[in-house]
Amino acid sequence: MSASPAPTPEGADQAGPLYLTWDDIGLATTELAQQTLAAGVPQAVVGIVRGGLIPAVWIAHRLGVHDVRTIEVTRTTSDAVNAAKTPLPTVRNPASIGNLTGLDVLLVDDIAGSGTTLAHTAQMVRDLGPARVRTAVLAVNRANWPAGSEPHDRIDHIARLTTTWVVFPWEEQHDQL
């Protein structure tokens, strides 16, 4: 994976969920855009539905990219904190992503726990024939990360590392503060 500046460690030792604010998201998407820009502007930004949509659009705006696409991949069985996961990610309507042949693509999600959803989706995108696929996430939850590997071994751009559940400002639980 590409070398990126060290992600910010906020929330690394926090007890309970980490509630990110819209300001946090603005800073994180700016950081991810800067990391991405260091290796060149992508031709398309693909957001993983649902959580990756908002950061994908913000990053695309910061990079001046107009080609923003989506791919619906699910693994978490509900929106509850520490919700159960299915063994493998499920892709719904894979044709919705369109033709990526020869494009430089940035694939964006909000969170990587084990990294399985992002890795599975990145491989599916690579199978569509783009020239390059880079990955970016707002946060990595190291509490769920596989032992013996580092997030930067599998993810190109990371804004934040934590060891707790992350609640984003667009999620229902966020308003229950």
What spans do the regions from the language model cover?
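Short glycine-rich phosphate-binding loop at a beta-alpha junction
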Residues: 41-49
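Short, glycine/charge-rich flexible loops or terminal/linker lids adjacent to PRPP-binding catalytic cores
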Residues: 29, 65-105, 116-120
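Structural beta-sheet core signal
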Residues: 70, 107, 135-137
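Glycine-rich phosphate-binding loop signature in dinucleotide/nucleotide-binding domains
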Residues: 36-41, 98-101, 128-129
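PRPP-dependent phosphoribosyltransferase catalytic core
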Residues: 2-12, 123-177
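Substrate-recognition/cap helix-loop segment adjacent to the acidic, metal-dependent catalytic center
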Residues: 56-67
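Active-site-facing substrate-recognition patch
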Residues: 1-41
